[in-house]
Regions:
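Signature of dsDNA virion morphogenesis modules
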Residues: 1-188
Length: 188
């Protein structure tokens, strides 16, 4: 396994604007691998589809198009072309118990992208599949009136029996997530 580090798109933008400070181009065709970054999104518990025993329906709002807070830009046409890539992907999560003075028994919560190094120095990701985005995920670009942005939205399912993920989503109704973007071409 190669040494990888999870990078948010803000980290990538910060690197190019504050550290690298020169024009550059990236092409997955030349390197043989895409550049993978995380973007922030939301997942909502969706009570509208109760026809799947053992599967909790969820609705995910992932990245938005056009100019981002960090100065990066994802064109609508690029996002539209990438919509099919959401199908048949796992929903990953890392869950841990949080105890507080007010709640010494603890409560299960989602955590961030936990990872550790194995004995060979390779990065091992501690997240595990907690659900699936099926082929019928209804991936589409949707304008969010409140946020005044167009987001990629998909439907998925959380496994009810295999983790505490469904319990957390039913309790919280909405949770923050990050979504992987695979960058095949980039210029700065």
């Amino acid at each position: 396994m190669s040494k990888k580090r999870l990078l948010f798109i803000e980290d990538l933008y910060d690197f190019y604007s504050n550290k690298y400070k020169r024009s550059t181009k990236f092409s997955a065709e030349k390197t043989g691998e895409p550049l993978v970054v995380q973007v922030h999104g939301r997942v909502n518990f969706d009570e509208s589809d109760k026809n799947k025993d053992g599967l909790l329906p969820v609705h995910l709002q992932s990245c938005h198009t056009d100019l981002n807070v960090n100065g990066s830009n994802i064109e609508s046409s690029v996002m539209e072309a990438a919509l099919p890539s959401f199908s048949n992907r796992p929903i990953l999560g890392y869950i841990h118990k949080v105890t507080t003075d007010e709640n010494p028994e603890g409560q299960w919560e989602f955590y961030s992208h936990n990872m550790h190094e194995d004995e060979n120095g390779d990065v091992v990701y501690d997240e595990y599949p907690i659900g699936i985005i099926p082929e019928s995920c209804n991936a589409q670009l949707v304008y969010d009136e409140e946020k005044k942005k167009t987001y990629c939205e998909v439907d998925g399912y959380i496994f009810e029996e295999y983790s505490k993920a469904a319990e957390i989503l039913q309790r919280e109704e909405e949770c923050s997530v990050s979504v992987e973007l695979s960058i095949r071409e980039l210029s700065y």
